[in-house]
Amino acid sequence: MKHWIAGLAGAGLFIFAVAAFGADTPSRAIVRAPSTVKPDPVSALPGAKIFNEHCAGCHGARAVGAEGPSLSDEYWIHGRTDADIGKAIRGGFDPKMAAFDFTDAQITDLVAYIRAVFVATLVVDRSVQAVPADVQHTEVADFRVETVAKFTAPYAFVFLPDGRALITETAGTLRVVDKGKLLPEAIEGIPIGTPLQGPGRRILNIALHPDYAKNGWIYLTIADNNPAGRGFVMRVVRGKIKGSRWTDHQVLFEAPTGEASTARMAFDRQGYLFMTLGFSGNIYPGPPEDAPSLDLSDPNGKVLRMHDDGRAPADNPFVNIPGALKLVWSYGHRQSLGIAFDSKGTLWESENGARGGDEVNIIKKGANYGWPVVTWGHRYDSIPRVAMPEMEGVEQPVVSWAPSPAVSAMAFYESDVFPRWKGNLFVGSMKYRSLYRIVLKENRQVLQEEVLRGIDRVRDVGVGPDGCVYLLTDGGLFLRLAPA
């Protein structure tokens, strides 16, 4: 306490001295050097203020994308004319985007701003910064970032036992990288269904059967138009590759959904397939406790567990509850963009919150994760609604972020190439274009390090057979983090 009082006394003397000095000094005009910062004409547009207040939380600063998609690139799902953009702003799209009660003049200003951002982006590539050529130094490891290949709107990758990599492109193609080179021809014959309006997203995640070396099964999640109305149908399919062709195609599961970006898959040691299906609930009109993510009869906002052929296991937690979907393993999830097992067989999930509240969770059988009633973020509506961060009977995250980095996929590192990374969890970020290394002890975070920042929106993360960490970005880069 004495030190604190002495500090205040010293501060008081300093303030007095400054005041006295100012009193004895003649007043004079301050001459400042002219600013060298060029004004940004786009940021000065009337629509910029409206966008920053109402839209940037989802779509990122200058519309480059965060949790929501970029509005400054060539991928337009709901049309690219001024009328299309205005219609989307005014009417929204259930359940992903709220309708906004703007005046016609405000909508005109917003459309003009989005148009200006798009034109500016054509001149300067905002999406992919230069891959660093120098060695990256982190707390316990040094590495170089190498570009393996480039793609168009990729989503996920997996390595085959022979070292080749399969990469999905959301427009509906499956590509092959062999010995560090992208093969010119895509895999043919994958039934991708009716193309979504605009380029959209069709083929998403990919996984190999645990006995792939014997049976050759490859699993995909595919988004298709919903013939019954708005939204999509999400499918889990499997097939085999013979030569350069997709064969033996089977549909194992399908469900209507409003989310076309959150279907991740992972197999456990027993050969069960786990799949995530999101529910953002941005504009869900009913009471939060009645949201689809908390409704056991609805697949959205869930982690699902199935046999390798799509059947529901008899020991799933809700198989004996009338009306419940027998595939449900856990519920109350928002946007699950990553799923992975650690070396002990524990299932982990990375999840986008709304305004804040991004999470990494341990997924437990039959557990409730709370969304949208319980979250460390804020719900999106015309105005944000605050939910409770904790509630009895609801699981708490192991890691939580605020503000939100828009976390994406994740992977555990178990190789010896970077020995001091062993057992660490790597999580990608779309908003900050980062890669996080998380050190865990007894299933609790003890350290978090940002090992890479600013290259591009990280969409997928994995570890290759060579022990290197691989990243796939929205800008089309397939990157390798190799020892320096």
Predicted regions and their residues:
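Electrostatic cytochrome c docking/interface patches
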Residues: 23-50, 325
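Extracytoplasmic electron-transfer domains, predominantly the class I c-type cytochrome c fold
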Residues: 26, 33, 37, 41, ...
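Sequence/structural segment immediately N-terminal to covalent heme-attachment motifs in c-type
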Residues: 40-61, 83-91, 148, 152
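Short pre-active-site segment immediately N-terminal to redox-active cysteine/selenocysteine motifs
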Residues: 43, 51-57, 62, 67, ...
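Acidic, Gly/Ser/Thr-rich repeat motifs that build Ca2+-stabilized beta-propeller blades
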Residues: 107, 114-282, 338-340, 346-353, ...
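Surface-exposed loop and turn segments in beta-propeller and other repeat-based domains
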Residues: 184-199, 249-262, 299, 308-329, ...
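Beta-propeller blade signature
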Residues: 233-243, 291-308, 363-364
